[in-house]
Amino acid sequence: KMQLGDWVALDAEPGSYFGATPTALTSQAYYALSAQLLALAAEVLGNRQDAELYAGVHRQAAQDFAANFFTLDGAMTAQTQTAHILALRFGLTPQKWKQKTIQRLLELLEQQNGHLVTGFLGTPYFCAALSQNGCWQQAYDLMLKKDYPGWLYQVLQGATTVWEHWDGRRPDGTMWSAGMNSFNH
């Protein structure tokens, strides 16, 4: 079965649309999130039986995520920004490894000079994962980066909407791909 994973992440192999975060990890993370949201919706709707059912599915999915994507010493098996973002933002990081996961995300961010290299699955949650874990300054700095890759880089290039690719138009004027390069996402 094909999964798009962290689509158009900058940590992809050259010429690939698929980011470096394993699709098994992104699929499991979003499965857990979906179960959690279903449990919350059922609770709001007053359907206690479904709320309990989906809360149980979420608990099991979170346990499976930890077993599959954390080593015995608490390191994530995938050393990507997206892996750490999803684990933190979706509440899938075991408490005993939370600080280690936060620290590693900050290291991965620093390795990119404070820039993101995430795709469609990691990007929407990056600033929230940072700020919810006390990293307000890093979230603020990330959001306001004016150079490539970053949101304000796109704005300074004349963008009025978010581009499909971070490198839709590179600083040297070249494009990632003329065949698939939407400037309206």
Provide a role label for each language-model segment.
Residues 1-185:
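Active-site core of glycosidic bond-cleaving carbohydrate-active enzymes
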